[in-house]
Structures are given as structure tokens and as C-alpha cells.
Amino acid sequence: MSRPSNTPWLTPYLTVASGRAALDFYQRAFGFKAGHVVDENGVPTHAEMQYKGQIVIMFAPEGAWGSTARTPRSMGVEAPQTFYLYCEDVDALYARATGAGATSIMPPADQFWGDRYCMVEDPDGYRWGFATPLAKAPDAKPTP
């Protein structure tokens, strides 16, 4: 079995409100780079976003290709999943993301599992957790 070299075995495919707005946000907020983009009359109807040379998400706007899928935000619900992505500097990425319009859910903090971690929500209501490994995990109390 084969796959493209820059594509992981699993890639989330999101529905976004606006392909153009999502392309702009993910580049400004998270530093993602646009990969393959299908543009119909100036409207992105499919896009791949890359991080460190790998595709991390693909997306299409609501209504594209006859889809009835909607974003968490347009449905008025909290996204049931969080995307977890390692980065070089979680504090810098958090500042960049919130400066670009992401909503803070959890500011950066050292976590018991050994990462410095934060969580933000993008304009479409998807939640993103970013982490940087700590040199040493904090001391954790064992679960009884």
C-alpha cells in the first residue's frame, strides 16, 4: 500500500465556513502552508494545509461538492475533538494564534504528562492543542 510522501496515513478533512478565510487564518495563526488548492472562480473549494512538510488538514467550505456538513460554530456546538500538534515554542504559537483571532481556551501551562500545552479555538469552532515537550515531566501523584 502506498501514499504520497508528504501525507500521513490519517488526515482530518474539515468543513469550514469560507475556504479563503480558513486559508488565511491557518497560515497567519498556526504558520501552516497552503498545499494543493482547488480554486473555482476565485473561491477555494478544497485545500490542503501543511506543517513541517506534512499535510495536517484538508478542508472544503460548507456546501462544496454538494456536502451538507457544517462547522461546529455554524451548528452552535462545541467541537467533540481537539487536534494535538507539537510545535517548537508553544508560548510563541499561542501568542501568534490568539493575535490572529483564535479564541483562548487554555493558556500555555506545564502539564503532568510532560508537555507544555495550550488550547485555542479557530473561527470555525475547531479546537487545537499545541504542545512542546518539557525537559522533565512534572512530578505526578499516582492514581489510586
Model-flagged regions — what are they?
Residues 1-13, 23-121, 131-144:
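Vicinal oxygen chelate
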Residues 16-20:
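Short acidic-aromatic low-complexity motifs
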Residues 124:
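C-terminal catalytic core of tyrosine-transesterase DNA break-rejoin enzymes
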